[in-house]
Each structure stands twice: as structure tokens, then as C-alpha cells.
UniProtKB/Swiss-Prot annotation:
GO terms for molecular function: ATP binding; helicase activity; hydrolase activity. The gene is MAA3. GO terms for cellular component: nucleus. Probable helicase that may regulate RNA molecules involved in nucleolar organization and pollen tube guidance. Residues 781-790, 798-818 have a biased composition (Acidic residues). Its main location: nucleus. This is Probable helicase MAGATAMA 3. Keywords: ATP-binding, Helicase, Hydrolase, Nucleotide-binding, Nucleus. Transmembrane segments: none annotated. ATP binds at residues 280-287. Disulfide bonds: none annotated. It comes from the Eukaryota. Residues 259-559 form the UvrD-like helicase ATP-binding domain. The keyword ATP-binding applies.
Amino acid sequence: MAIDNGKLQEEEASSVTRFYNIILGWDYKQLTKENERKNRKDSKEKLNVVKNTYKDVDDYFETFEPLLFEEVKAQILQNKDGEEASVCKMRLVMECNEGEGFHFLLVTYEHEEDEYLAQNDLLLLSKEEVKGNSFPSSYGFAVVEHRQNNLLRLRMYLAEDIVQITKNTKSSRTKSFIQALSNMRSLITSSASPIDKRVFSLKLCGLSTIIREYIALRSVSSLPFKDLIFTAAEKSCGFGDEAWKISGPLNEFFNENLNKSQKEAIDVGLSRKSFVLIQGPPGTGKTQTILSILGAIMHATPARVQSKGTDHEVKRGIQMTIQEKYNHWGRASPWILGVNPRDAIMPEDGDDGFFPTSGNELKPEVVNASRKYRLRVLVCAPSNSALDEIVLRLLSSGLRDENAQTYTPKIVRIGLKAHHSVASVSLDHLVAQKRGSAIDKPKQGTTGTDIDSIRTAILEEAAIVFATLSFSGSALLAKSNRGFDVVIIDEAAQAVEPATLIPLATRCKQVFLVGDPKQLPATVISTVAQDSGYGTSMFERLQKAGYPVKMLKTQYRMHPEIRSFPSKQFYEGALEDGSDIEAQTTRDWHKYRCFGPFCFFDIHEGKESQHPGATGSRVNLDEVEFVLLIYHRLVTMYPELKSSSQLAIISPYNYQVKTFKDRFKEMFGTEAEKVVDINTVDGFQGREKDVAIFSCVRANENGQIGFLSNSRRMNVGITRAKSSVLVVGSAATLKSDPLWKNLIESAEQRNRLFKVSKPLNNFFSEENLETMKLTEDMEIPDAPLYEDESLPVAPYGGDDDFGDGDADQDDVAMAGED
């Protein structure tokens, strides 16, 4: 069915207009007052709670649109008083025009100071500089449209009419704000000279991602599988007739190299179901499964091909030598070699565009007759890091073709902040390569139009495109003449539903949602939206509604003693250990009970304290000191652990993480980042280390543990380690929560619960270590459960050279710490 691009663009423009009519009409002063109120029951009563299923598009939209705008409000106010608060900049209004109900301004732009400004950034424009909690006489929101002749083009909505979000919304403007808008309108439209039309701008936040989410939300009614999204039920489409199959060699390879649950996930995908949900618990080979799915769907063919009333098996091509394959790849991927695509012999429509499946690049007509066109796949993830992990794995291991031979397909990674390890396939790099080859040729220029043409050619020829969820809604992909047949979303449980909708608008026919609702959810800034279920991912919602989910069950990361608790607590005991995983994860330091594989250290005399600033984050200095003792003892006895690639320190609280980093910088200077990896729980999802030390922080008499009670945060925190996870916390405080009580009791049952008294360094004395040493013929010694005797003090020191330095890592921003 043909896609009416004109209609799509018209609908998108309508969505953008409505979005800015609402956002730009808000009163910043009123928003700050609402935010200061501790209890916002009045707002929550107007919001629909996210449900598992919906009657129709109106029911769906009336739920999500108000929640999305609540999130916008929270993002606007997020940095108001924080460390990242912006500074007011004075600008001159050079020109002002009206159109479509908006005012469009051209204001002065300072190149060096304004580099931080980007399209869709939201600004507060005012007559006077905004200082503290005082508000100027004239103010209003403005959004950055683009740069024009060394000027910034801004959009404002200064009409007195307010655009309501829903029919139940009863918003109104105060008289003071109406006057402020009137004053601003008079200022920017006056005939005075620019020097007399000074305004101040304050950057509040970027809106690019959330406006893409809004456009996707508004276009949900045009999706071919909208009914499935609403009802979580897929209509019977006779999948048996439409199912695809893979070649014998490729199927044999998967049978030999994948476990049962991974192979079943591929089979579900080949059934051609519109939505395929794959749950990947920690260490179950989720990324490998995604690569296998890519290999399968790139080379799948209809199970039977009808030809003149007779069923025929699909023809298979002959094998090529590796040199012949590389020769063909060079022609099929011209930008890699700097060749002009128009000068190259391009693969015929129907070829996969890489190593020819026909077995003969000179006879493309021998390509499988059942493949009418080359499949295109869009692979997305919520974050750059999650996306680049897949790209890197694909580059390092490749895919398998129908002959089960390894090859590297034509791929392109679009968007910002690509990791340096995948830069070779980034769009910018490929364009630069192509431009370089063009410059060397006579009569060839590199105008803006030429660059756009190069980008388009690269995207059109790539079989797999990688983009974050947000960037999949960029104009770059929207300009493409072709959509995508398949969309694969990794870490799908970490995305709010509107974000998941963005890549689905690319005309795809099949969607794979891969993730784990038992691990970290999406970050939602607004507590009002969070309480209404806005953080629920589409994956989780469909799963709750009963949509079938294929779970990967064999884990290849954790020692069985680490796997035991999360499997029972979060996955109903379904996780199995890969072959020889115990032998692969057993280490020399396991001869001591206190070094794993699974331990809980009860710092029963520790106390938490709160960050003096407005962040609300917490720190526990006793836990900091004890973790340093663990680290020192481990790396002194086992020097191979003195590496950030081997050992991690994890904590849910930013303040605790910062304190750890400061202490390690004091000890190791510029080498700090090399000797240990320190980050928040949120910053460690999807990663693994040999040893992980988890600092819980919370220790108080009231048994309050804040967001530490989040089961997903616990699951991620304790499943990062391959050989040893060492949990440090206050047993008395944590036992107030049923989940943590279960974990502590699990440690106790395994004789791996240690009570640590002050002075803390007594615990790792030579004498005490001997009591915790396992003999060769026993796994759990007959040793006291709690170690609280007064023992000689072990010297805290060593051969390390301590120095000064300022190396640090960026903290992962978290919302709602408490």
C-alpha cells in the first residue's frame, strides 16, 4: 500500500502546532508554584492511570497525552535550582513576524557562548533578568526553531486563549500572566530599534525527544497493528501459511550454537507475528539472540513457494571463495571504499546487498526467487550505550548467512554520541569518507545538496540501520523513500510507551520488543506521571495483559550461588545455568567465605546522612570505609582485580557514588578510573564485572529505605557480577522491606551473612581471615555466623603509590532519589 507522505507531513505539522500551542502557553511562574506544593492530588485526579488494554484510540490518547505533558512540566523544572541551572543571556530582537497563531522572532546569537543551544530547546524569554524566585513584568516561553544568518529564530505563543489538553482540563491564566504576555507582545512587536528591544533568555530544557514521542503518540491511529497495541490481542492471520523458514545450514548452526529458549525466540520471529516479545533476564545472552534474529530474518524465505500450482523448495546458491565475497562486498558497499555508488555495479533488487546469496555475483537472477526485495531492519534502544553494544558485537562477530558463513552486513549507525569503537559505521564517518573520495575527483563538489544525497544513498543501501528510539523519529529517516520491514527494540522495558511508538511509524511490518521488565524501568521525572503508571513500558503492559512472551532461560554470566536468589525471587526459579558456568566463574578468592560468591556484610553500627543540597541523595560513610577495606584486601591478595574491567563498586545513590570516587581519587590520583569502576545501579544495567561490591547506604532507626525497595534496582545491582557479589548494608534497616529480608535470610541460610563491628578494619585481620578460610573438602565451614569478636587490627596500607588527580566519571542522572 502506498504511503501518502504529504498526508503524514500534514499530520505531523498539526501535532507540532498543538504541542507548542500547549507548551508555549504555560505560565512558568504558575508551574513553579505547582511544583512547590508537596501534595498534588488535584492534578492526579484529572489524570487517567495507565491500563493494560484500551477500548480504542481515543481511550488510549486521553490516557497518555496528559501524562506526557506532566512529564514535560517536570523536565522544564528539573534544573531550576540544580547545579546545571542555566545563566540568563541578553539578546536583541532584530525582527518579529506573526503566523499560524505564533510570533516568530529573530534574536542575536553569540557563537561561542550559544553553542549549547539546539533546535527545540525551550527558553524563558523576559524583559528583565530572572534572579532567584522573582519574576519579571514581561515573560513567556520560546522555543528555538533554527539558526538563520547568525541569528536565532524563536517561536512564541502569546495569544490570550489557552489550549486545553483534554476536555476535562480546566486550566486558566492568572491576570498577572495575561498582563505579562501582553507586555511581552508589546515589547517584541514595537517599532523601536533593536537596542531598545532587549530581552533575556534562560535555557530550561531540550524538547526534541519528547516532541518526537508526542508526534508518534498522535499518529498511533495510522499504525497497521494499532488494535494489537490497544487490546494486546493479535488477530489470527494464519501464521502457519505466512511463516518463513531459514536454510538447512543456518538452522543447523543455530541448533548447535544456541540454547533451547534462544532458538524458540527465533522460531517465534519466523512465524511472522506482528509483535514478538522476548524477555532477557541478566546474563541470558540477549545480545547474541538479537544478532541471531538479525541473521535469521535477513536470510529467511517463505516456507513454500507457489509456482504454477506446484510447491517448490527454494533454490540455494553455490559457495563463493572468501576473496569473491569481499569483491562483491566492495561493490555492494561502495562508500566503504570511497567509490561513487553511481559508478559501481549495484546489487539487483532482491539481493541482500552483501555477500551474494546466489553464489554468483555475475548472475543476480539466480537469487532466491521468493525474495521479492531486500529486507530492511531498524534496530533501536533507549540509550546510546545499549545501542552501541549491539553495533560493536555485530562488528566483532558478524552475522551468519544462509550457508552459516560469517559476514558483515551493510550497516549504519545514525545519531549523536556514538561510541568511538563503532565510529567506523557512523553516518558522519561514512559521509566524510565519501566526501573525501569525491573531492579527489575532477568536477565534483560537496555542496549541502550533495551531502544530503550521500546521506540518503547510504541510508537507502544499508540493510540494518541503528538509531536510538528518539533519533528514529528524526527528519533524517523521515526523508527516506523506504520504510523498514522489521523493527527490533532492545532494552524495550526501559522506555516509556510513547518512546516505543517512535520507530513503529517507519511503516514496519514486524516488531521485536526485547528487554526485561524485572530490571530497571524508564526514567520518569514527574512523580505525578510516575504515580499514574507513565513509567510502564509497552513491553510490560502487553505482558501484563496476557500477550505471550518468550523468556530466555539459560544464563551464562553468574556463578550459581549468585544466580540462585534472583532466579527464585524474580523469575519463579526459571533460570538455568549454562554448561560449565560454575567452573568458569569459580575463582581463587572463593577459598574465603567473605569473598563470595555471594555475601552480605551487616554494618550494624553504620548511619546514613543526607546531601546538604537540594538533591535529597544520601551517603553512608561507614559503608564507604568498609568497601574501601574490602577493595584493599582483595587487590592486595589478588592483584589481578586491581582493574576497572574486573571490579566494580555500585550504589543506588549519586552522593554515595561521588564519595567513593572522591576517596579513590585521593588514593590513586589519575589512575582511579583504571583501578575500579564506580557507578550507580542505573549506570550499570547491561554491564558485568568479575566482582561487584554493592553499597546499600540506607541505615536508620525507622526502617526507611526509599527507592532501595524497588525490586528492579535490587535485581540489577546484585546480578552484575560473574564470580562474586558482595553486598554491604544495614541488616536491621533493610529487613523492614520483605524483599531485602528475603535476600538477607538467603545469605544467612548459606552461612554468608557477616556482622561487622567497629573498628571496621578488624574484620580483615589475618587471624579473622583464617577463620573464614574454606578447606578443600568443604563448601561451607562450621564457622560462626556473625564475626564480632575483637581481633587485632590489620594494617591498612600496602605497596600502592597514592597521588593526586582529578579523574572522574560522569554520574548517571537519576530521578526520584529518596
